[in-house]
Amino acid sequence: MARTQAEPPASQPDARAAWLRDQLERANHAYYVLDQPDLPDAEYDRLFRELQQLETDHPELVTPDSPTQRVGGEAAGGFTPVVHDAPMLSLNNGFADEDIVAFDKRVADALAKTTDLAGSVTDPVEYACELKFDGLAISLRYEQGVFVQAATRGDGTTGEDVTENVRTIRSIPLKLKGKHVPAVLDVRGEVLMFKRDFARLNERQRAAEQREFANPRNAAAGSLRQLDSKITAQRPLSFFAYGIGVLDGMPMPDTHSALLDWYESLGLPVNRERAVVHGAEGLLDFFRKVGEKRESLPYDIDGVVYKVNRRDEQERLGFVSRAPRFALAHKFPAQEALTKLVAIDVQVGRTGAITPVARLEPVFVGGATVTNATLHNEDEVRRKDIRIGDTVIVRRAGDVIPEVVGALLDRRPADAAEFVMPTECPVCGSKIERLPDEAIARCTGGLFCPAQRKQALWHFAQRRALDIDGLGEKIIDQLVELNLVRTPADLFNLGFATLAELDRFAEKSAQNLIDSLEKAKHTTLARFIYGLGIRHVGESTAKDLAKHFGSLTPIMDASIEELLEVNDVGPIVAESLHQFFAEEHNRTVIEQLRAPGKVTWPEGPPAPKAPQGVLAGKTVVLTGTLPNLTRDAAKEMLEAAGAKVAGSVSKKTDYVVAGAEAGSKLAKAEELGIPVLDEDGLHQLLEGNTP
């Protein structure tokens, strides 16, 4: 948002008011006309409240074109203007509990509600409470029950004709239900996009290499205001009705809650998260309950709305210039706010991911004080053009990690510095690498890096790797936090006395883990490679590497070209392997693991050709429980004999090995006439004898 003048101080009310009007009008134009909002809601609200207060303190400063005297933005070009039969007003906002109590008191006083000697209202006001959706307000006009026109709010008096686009919203009925419909009905409501639909839309945008939307509100607004309704038809928009403009040919319902019930009977979509309450206490209780479930709702809301329920009381209360006196929007703490970005550091995740983190001047947003926010990755920093020293928009929603949405370029200082991604890990000093076609840069010091220690140990110990039974996440947490284990090699130095002292670790558990560690020393090359936790190297690739090279040293010393010769190893996997073994820290840990008395496995020469036995090239399916072999052991034996172990039975299956409680796979094999073997038959086949 470009500035045309320096920001005047509060001591100059005339200049300050003019500046505030200019800032707000520019923000309105960007939001309503350009569809490019560039000022957070919280900042807009703050500037608006300041202008309101200035005009209250200095009535002579009020101008006819002040944003406080109007509802929204002007109609944009490209759509036919529509003059609303009844103005589409916005609502005054409340933020603190005190604002709600004051609102209730104003309403009660205006309605001359009775009070007791202590001044407490004995006849509390009845309110209808609803959600405040984060979308785009529209009006729907029905004549004799048939939908004829839709218009945006615009400036409250004149909006834009979006009839053809609204026709594509499937939740909006083109004809009202029931035999008795009004001659004219002007329905007020909100067009929005559900969270799941927003996620799917952005997936489609990415797949088509088109611009993604920042949030569901922007997506809904942009979709509704498409000049081509065919595009709108492809966008998953929804609608909720919540108000009324004009009603002819029928009496108006006596209460707002009755109006919404009537809408439902007409087939209009009405949100069910609503209630009728009494007094300020009821309002605040509704607000708290909605706040607790806010993040689990399938759509975005930014507050709740309170309306005096009785229609006759609404009429008595009337309106001010831009809003009804009988209603108030109670907004949640702002999810976006402005602050200064003072530095950008990098954080190393459990898997080695390097994430830029913004260090911020403290700002209260989303109900908490935020000093740090994620910048996701280097590409995001570049795309958003975020620099050190910028004034930035920070967003925090619920329990979601705060993020920097963007920078206000018009406020950028001359000395703002660009972010430079480090080349070495700030934790362990290992090289930082970024694979082709990946957004995330990573530390290559996997086994050595303290930031990755817990993840590396957990992966090393899992069943398909070294299979260290009893070494769970809670034990790993203690071992790392007490600095007893730095790398996987340190696991094999643990003694009974050390383990027995761990929290909630009995002597029997300690001995079981010692026994499990001793057993884990005898493994296979494939399991060991998989246990190293090399990025993109799964169980199958580890087996292919072990088969191809026969021993570990040739794998560690292999060039990318040599790695590419391995079955199913492509450029990304080869690059990942090469980077891992090129890091000296990783080689050191591997040598420690291979030291005398540590991990061993049978090594052999590289396989010059595929196995030539009766199982070579055959497809085998395992099902049920075998008497003496685990499924993993049977799978390893079959693969060593050149067979492929599949997960489902088909016409291409050569054998099915069935144990106890074999299920549908056995039935399918019998149906297709595929040979079925038990464990003895499997052993015969492995020995080269046809069972």
Swiss-Prot record:
Keywords: DNA damage, DNA repair, DNA replication, Ligase, Magnesium, Manganese, Metal-binding, NAD, Zinc
Residue ranges occupied by any BRCT domain in the UniProt entry: 610-691
Residues annotated as binding Zn(2+): 425, 428, 443, 449
Binding site for NAD(+): 41-45, 90-91, 130, 153, 190, 307, 331
Cofactor: Mg(2+); Mn(2+)
Gene Ontology CC annotations of this record: cytosol
SUPFAM superfamilies in the record: BRCT domain, DNA ligase/mRNA capping enzyme, catalytic domain, Nucleic acid-binding proteins, RuvA domain 2-like
Record-linked SMART domains: BRCT (SM00292), HhH1 (SM00278), LIGANc (SM00532)
Molecular function, one GO term: metal ion binding
Reactions accelerated catalytically: NAD(+) + (deoxyribonucleotide)n-3'-hydroxyl + 5'-phospho-(deoxyribonucleotide)m = (deoxyribonucleotide)n+m + AMP + beta-nicotinamide D-nucleotide
PANTHER family in alphabetical order: CHROMOSOME TRANSMISSION FIDELITY FACTOR 18, DNA LIGASE
Protein name, per record: DNA ligase
Phylogenetic classification of the source organism: Bacteria, Pseudomonadati, Pseudomonadota, Betaproteobacteria, Burkholderiales
Gene: ligA
